[in-house]
Amino acid sequence: MNHAKQESEVMNLPSTIEVYCVERSLPGLTEKQLADVHWALLRTVERVAKNGGQIRYVRSTFIPDQSRCICIFESSSRELVRTVNETAQIPFTRIENALDFNFLGG
């Protein structure tokens, strides 16, 4: 069994999910504070998934010159993505549906 399938099963993800992009402005954060944001999201997603929520935190990318952070989630709903971010108490500007072409490889 491949790793991706195992991970999806652990995170309660259905076979068809949506990809969501969460955009945030995080001016003045240190690398340590950015790492704390990452870990807060991981812990919150894990807790929500263990309680039956169909969500996975994929990754974040920080753009230092713009103090902008883009976080990618896979989830059964935008509302669940919103709930995770609000529960983690990480401010965000917006949540949008997205396409993730990472599966194409490189």
Regions found by a protein language model. Name each.
Residues Y20-R24, V58-N85:
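Short, well-ordered beta-strand segments in beta-rich or mixed alpha/beta enzyme
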Residues V45-R68, E96:
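Short, glycine- and small/hydrophobic-rich beta-strand elements in well-ordered beta-sheets
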Residues E74-N102, G106:
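An amphipathic, aromatic/His-enriched active-site/gating alpha helix that lines ligand/cofactor pockets
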